[in-house]
């Protein structure tokens, strides 16, 4: 069999929650086989745990066949530092914020030089805090991740799973409105809906391009700069999604 196929922008092989504890070694073997066909992203167990150390050992073994890691249950910047020191230089690390303590540490996690993005682990976060899945309840933690990412100068965070297939587009639209730049999907069938939610409408793109075309190339009034920045970001997002 060849490599794994998906409509998603990035396929992440889940070594943390993808298999029960007694079958973790089986999951690593599958990842090893997949990496023979193309570099892979791995979701690894929490730093400092036995499973986490075994996952890092696999990452070192894969070397340049490791495209990046999603660090589950990241507790703080020390976890990012440990993972970065345990893997080949420059491997992208997406740190998952999945607890109340991790949310409070999000600015420091985002500011670590090895952190590429933050991701919101909504299920475990809700379990830790007792919050419901209601969007209003989760709006504050989502905003904290967006602000932490912006302050650290990294791309906006990745939202938690976009839910059932028929909810994926609406969940993605909400993520965009909150300032997220991606979402997780547990089903390949949910990916088209998520893509649709993140893809700007044609009339939005047309207005943004017209605004940029009509704007001067030199310095602009400070009050106008945010409008241009939003237009530029929208066009860039549309072009990136069109290229997928």
Each predicted region: which residue ranges?
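Expand to "…catalyze enediolate/carbanion chemistry for C-C bond making/breaking, isomerization
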Residues: 1-244
């Amino acid at each position: 069999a060849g490599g794994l196929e998906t409509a998603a922008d990035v396929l992440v092989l889940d070594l943390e929650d993808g298999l029960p504890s007694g079958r973790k070694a089986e999951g690593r073997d599958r990842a090893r086989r997949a990496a023979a066909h193309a570099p892979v992203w791995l979701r690894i167990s929490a730093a400092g745990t036995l499973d986490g150390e075994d996952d890092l050992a696999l990452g070192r073994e894969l070397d340049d066949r490791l495209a990046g890691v999603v660090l589950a249950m990241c507790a703080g910047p020390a976890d990012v530092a440990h993972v970065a020191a345990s893997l080949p230089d420059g491997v992208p690390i997406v740190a998952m914020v999945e607890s109340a303590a991790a949310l409070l540490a999000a600015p420091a996690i985002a500011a670590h030089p090895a952190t590429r993005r933050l991701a919101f682990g909504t299920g475990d976060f809700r379990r830790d805090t007792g919050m419901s899945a209601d969007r209003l309840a989760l709006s504050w933690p989502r905003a904290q991740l967006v602000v932490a990412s912006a302050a650290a100068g990294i791309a906006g965070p990745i939202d938690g799973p976009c839910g059932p297939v028929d909810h994926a587009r609406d969940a993605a639209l909400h993520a965009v409105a909150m300032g997220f730049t991606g979402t997780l999907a547990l089903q390949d069938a949910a990916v088209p809906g998520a893509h649709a939610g993140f893809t700007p409408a044609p009339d939005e793109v047309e207005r943004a391009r017209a605004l940029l075309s009509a704007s001067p190339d030199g310095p602009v009034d400070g009050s106008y700069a945010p409008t241009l920045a939003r237009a530029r970001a929208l066009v860039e997002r549309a072009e990136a999604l069109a290229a997928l």
